[in-house]
């Protein structure tokens, strides 16, 4: 039995001063039961908790650590900047320019970019910009797609809403909800119907080209092509939320994988190298509407702070120089094929999805293509599976509706241990 005595004590202490004992709801383990793991160190593909337990980590801080924890070049970049310059100035620095130039170089659709502090901030800002640019009010999002916790996005969102069993959040006003229209993922006719019934008043369509917060749900190529054509025809700003997929599924993100050019892109996670960073960028024609050159206001005390810029620069430089994507693909295939073999041995028919180094094992026999099919998953069986994996030293996202991330630091031994643990966990979950 896993010893989590210190974690349990810390959790009780935390609940007295932090709502639910955590600073992001899913971390409380409510959907899987048991004690949240309190972490003291991360190195490579492993995390160590406060009780000394070591885990092979497939969460990677919810996506940023494509290079693993504490990558030497990233740590060195942060330390160098902190010692030589400081932590933050609230004034421009050359590092901001360098990171912006690098992003523009590797993501061709981005002609200008603005740094913020989180993915939520990036998506909120992109929506405001689209509204200001088009002078329209409505936005279309997709059921199950999660774009952060901004009010406009907490209507039929994925991730936390699915994990906690709530379709939306109290505190979102009726007026805000009316301006957010929900379409069915991978269903272009549902989008056309909304556009037609709100003719001339749809400012933007925002989408995760790979839905990463209802599990991992890839878009169909023909769906994205039709979406691009519809936006062009109707003068709607197409926004790709690449907070999770940016620099993860390819250096140029999901838009590189699919060959689709959005008008605006939101980014986060990997571009901060583990520190809080978000960004939104796209066509110069649109971005020049952002204050101070334009009239669409957006600001931030710590936006573009040098520590985060240094970590992001180091991370993306490594990705651009070393091109680890073929290696990541090989590792992801090993996991995918290993899990598939286990399912066959146990006579189970579950849905596996994957794009690059992010994947999901859904506890349903349905093909998962949208919010409804993702929601058919057996979350009770997932909870049993999750806790068995944790006991085996495999740290997965504590929700059926999150991604499994592979890093450059996962070894062949790590992968084989994970496949073995997967077999035992599935066997337990299904009473085989």
Swiss-Prot record:
Coiled coil: none annotated. Its cofactor is pyridoxal 5'-phosphate. It comes from Chloroherpeton thalassium (strain ATCC 35110 / GB-78). Pathway: Porphyrin-containing compound metabolism; protoporphyrin-IX biosynthesis; 5-aminolevulinate from L-glutamyl-tRNA(Glu): step 2/2; Porphyrin-containing compound metabolism; chlorophyll biosynthesis. Its EC number is 5.4.3.8. One of its GO terms (molecular function) is transaminase activity. Its main location: cytoplasm. HAMAP family: HemL_aminotrans_3. GO terms for biological process: chlorophyll biosynthetic process; protoporphyrinogen IX biosynthetic process. It is found in: Cytoplasm. It comes from the Bacteria. Transmembrane segments: none annotated. It catalyses: (S)-4-amino-5-oxopentanoate = 5-aminolevulinate. This is Glutamate-1-semialdehyde 2,1-aminomutase. The modification N6-(pyridoxal phosphate)lysine is found at residue 269. One of its GO terms (cellular component) is cytoplasm. Gene3D superfamilies: Aspartate Aminotransferase, domain 1, Type I PLP-dependent aspartate aminotransferase-like (Major domain). Belongs to the class-III pyridoxal-phosphate-dependent aminotransferase family. HemL subfamily.
């Amino acid at each position: 039995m896993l010893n989590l005595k210190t974690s349990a004590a810390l959790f009780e202490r935390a609940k007295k001063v932090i709502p639910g004992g955590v600073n992001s709801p899913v971390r409380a383990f409510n959907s899987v039961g048991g004690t949240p793991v309190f972490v003291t160190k991360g190195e490579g593909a492993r995390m160590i908790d406060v009780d000394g337990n070591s885990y092979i980590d497939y969460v990677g801080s919810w996506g940023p650590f494509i290079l693993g924890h504490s990558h030497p070049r990233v740590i060195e970049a942060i330390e160098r900047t902190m010692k030589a310059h400081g932590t933050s100035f609230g004034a421009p620095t050359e590092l901001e320019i360098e990171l912006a130039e690098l992003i523009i170089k590797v993501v061709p659709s981005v002609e200008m970019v603005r740094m913020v502090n989180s993915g939520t901030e990036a998506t909120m800002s992109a929506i405001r910009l689209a509204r200001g640019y088009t002078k329209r009010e409505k936005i279309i999002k997709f059921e199950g797609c999660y774009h952060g916790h901004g009010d406009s996005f907490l209507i039929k969102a994925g991730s936390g809403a699915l994990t906690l069993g709530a379709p939306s959040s109290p505190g979102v006003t009726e007026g805000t909800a009316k301006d957010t229209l929900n379409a069915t993922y991978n269903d272009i006719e549902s989008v056309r119907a909304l556009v037609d019934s709100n003719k001339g008043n749809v400012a933007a369509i925002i989408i995760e080209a790979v839905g990463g917060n209802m599990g991992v749900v890839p878009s169909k190529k023909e769906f994205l092509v039709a979406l691009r054509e519809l936006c062009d025809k109707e003068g709607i700003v197409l926004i790709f939320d690449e907070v999770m997929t940016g620099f993860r599924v390819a250096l140029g993100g999901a838009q590189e994988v699919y060959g689709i050019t959005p008008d605006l892109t939101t980014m986060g996670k990997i571009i901060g190298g583990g520190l809080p960073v978000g960004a939104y960028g796209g066509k110069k024609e649109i971005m020049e509407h952002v204050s101070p050159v334009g009239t669409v206001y957006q600001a931030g005390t710590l936006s573009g702070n040098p520590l985060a810029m240094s970590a992001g620069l180091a991370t993306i430089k490594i990705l651009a120089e070393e091109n680890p994507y073929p290696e990541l693909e090989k590792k992801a295939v090993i996991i995918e094929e290993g899990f598939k073999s286990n399912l066959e041995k146990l006579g189970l028919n579950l849905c596996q999805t994957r794009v690059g180094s992010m994947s999901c094992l859904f506890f349903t026999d349905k093909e998962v293509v949208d919010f409804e099919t993702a929601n058919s998953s057996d979350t009770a069986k997932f909870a049993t599976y999750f806790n068995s994996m944790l006991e085996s030293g495999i740290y997965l996202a504590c929700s059926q509706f999150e991604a499994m991330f592979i890093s450059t630091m996962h070894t062949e031994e790590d992968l084989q241990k994970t496949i073995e643990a997967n077999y035992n966990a599935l066997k337990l979950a299904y009473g085989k």
